Amino acid sequence: MNRLPSSASALACSAHALNLIEKRTLDHEEMKALNREVIDYFKEHVNPGFLEYRKSVTAGGDYGAVEWQAGSLNTLVDTQGQEFIDCLGGFGIFNVGHRNPVVVSAVQNQLAKQPLHSQELLDPLRAMLAKTLAALTPGKLKYSFFSNSGTESVEAALKLAKAYQSPRGKFTFIATSGAFHGKSLGSLSATAKSTFRKPFMPLLPGFRHVPFGNIEAMRTALSECKKTGDDVAAVILEPIQGEGGVILPPQGYLTAVRKLCDEFGALMILDEVQTGMGRTGKMFACEHENVQPDILCLAKALGGGVMPVGATIATEEVFSVLFDNPFLHTTTFGGNPLACAAALATINVLLEQNLPAQAEQKGDMLLDGFLQLAREYPDLVQDARGKGMLMAIEFVDNEIGYNFASEMFRQRVLVAGTLNNSKTIRIEPPLTLTIEQCEQVLKATRKALAALRVSVEET
């Protein structure tokens, strides 16, 4: 039987939510009630699968962990009042920490003036953010298109490459095995995990995948495409594969890919949605090899953990295909004043506090600790790797990885697996993590591994 709409029910639910938003604290009964409501609403109206996923990585199989607020720059507090060191970082959005006061203030100040733009008049913050990114990004990158997410920034990059290369008779895209570029139809065509791809086949034609980090495979693919008339429009890749398991290519790989793109007349699209904004110890990961892409994709941390912001930055030569008709690719909310205020404040914080350098220093400290633990627990840990504050611990099997996340939850440290490699647990904290908190994370990791060893030996 069809359910009839209920304005009264919707009004009551929204009023209840607004009341919660106004509250700073909850008493015990309110916390219990909120937990029950959230679990029920996720089950009935969001997706029950999220509950089972959360159950698999929380202590005691309890999926009732409901976050309530940021505790500090680097911590989260749940409705039970438990504080967790955030080593997940919202999959890389909290580079400048949770509720960074500079970012929050910029957004609040802009909110007091104008939350969204008219769509007709020229909006100043979009212009200022584009100018700032032109100054910040490497090489000849100059023009920016703004969106709301990483997958949107990749979609814009693919369409831009198509618009530029189609008149040249080039329609093929080369991506890499293990890649993750998003889940909308175009970006999913570049993503490499069958779990995400198969339900939506056929995807966009013209995409090929080669092994990541294998420059000879890349050369062969470009050469074979040229021989068959399937000339390559662009190569798209991540400087470090994030969801693939924090996979670092051999030194010099990006440089070699750049040379191949130049040789075959293909554009180089770098997806720095996860590696950008200081995460790896440089503002952009491509700067470790001084590589300059034709198109750069940003999102996640660009909004400072306060607003969703995506950006696709390109050279003038490439971007100029949109000059005659700037409406060829647009989005209603991309580049809105609140998002641009957040992005400008985020860049300011990253530069003022030199957070990329801090990411390098604290990342080295953490990785040294993880490598030492990997040597001590070879029966559990297969590898520890990373660059800056983008790290991973890979376990010998999936179950140990899940159990490790659960044990870390007991230690009040939040971690999770990578989407394309479930054996691998990512360590991706805010760049503002303190030295003391780094030490706490290493202690928690040691305790979690010790508990896992006992558990494995008992089975």
UniProtKB/Swiss-Prot annotation:
Q: Which domain of life is it from?
A: Bacteria
Entry's InterPro entries?
Aminotrans_3, Aminotrans_3_PPA_site, Class-III_PLP-dep_AT, Putrescine_aminotransferase, PyrdxlP-dep_Trfase, PyrdxlP-dep_Trfase_major, PyrdxlP-dep_Trfase_small
Q: Does the keyword Transferase apply?
A: yes
NCBIfam families named in the record: PRK11522.1 (NF008570), putres_am_tran (TIGR03372)
UniProt-listed Enzyme Commission number(s)? 2.6.1.82, 2.6.1.29
Report which reactions are catalysed by this protein: an alkane-alpha,omega-diamine + 2-oxoglutarate = an omega-aminoaldehyde + L-glutamate; putrescine + 2-oxoglutarate = 1-pyrroline + L-glutamate + H2O; cadaverine + 2-oxoglutarate = 5-aminopentanal + L-glutamate
**Record-level Gene Ontology MF annotations:** diamine transaminase activity; identical protein binding; putrescine--2-oxoglutarate transaminase activity; pyridoxal phosphate binding
Q: What does this protein do?
A: Catalyzes the aminotransferase reaction from putrescine to 2-oxoglutarate, leading to glutamate and 4-aminobutanal, which spontaneously cyclizes to form 1-pyrroline. This is the first step in one of two pathways for putrescine degradation, where putrescine is converted into 4-aminobutanoate (gamma-aminobutyrate or GABA) via 4-aminobutanal. Also functions as a cadaverine transaminase in a a L-lysine degradation pathway to succinate that proceeds via cadaverine, glutarate and L-2-hydroxyglutarate.
Q: Which family does it belong to?
A: Belongs to the class-III pyridoxal-phosphate-dependent aminotransferase family. Putrescine aminotransferase subfamily.
EC class, as a word, reads transferase
* Keyword Nucleotidyltransferase among record annotations: no
This protein's species is Citrobacter koseri (strain ATCC BAA-895 / CDC 4225-83 / SGSC4696)
GO biological process, any: L-lysine catabolic process
Its UniProt pathway annotation is: Amine and polyamine degradation; putrescine degradation; 4-aminobutanal from putrescine (transaminase route): step 1/1
Entry keyword set = Aminotransferase, Pyridoxal phosphate, Transferase
- Protein name per the record: Putrescine aminotransferase
| Annotated positions of the N6-(pyridoxal phosphate)lysine modification | K300
Cofactor(s) this protein requires: pyridoxal 5'-phosphate
**Binding positions for pyridoxal 5'-phosphate?**
G150, T151, Q274, T332
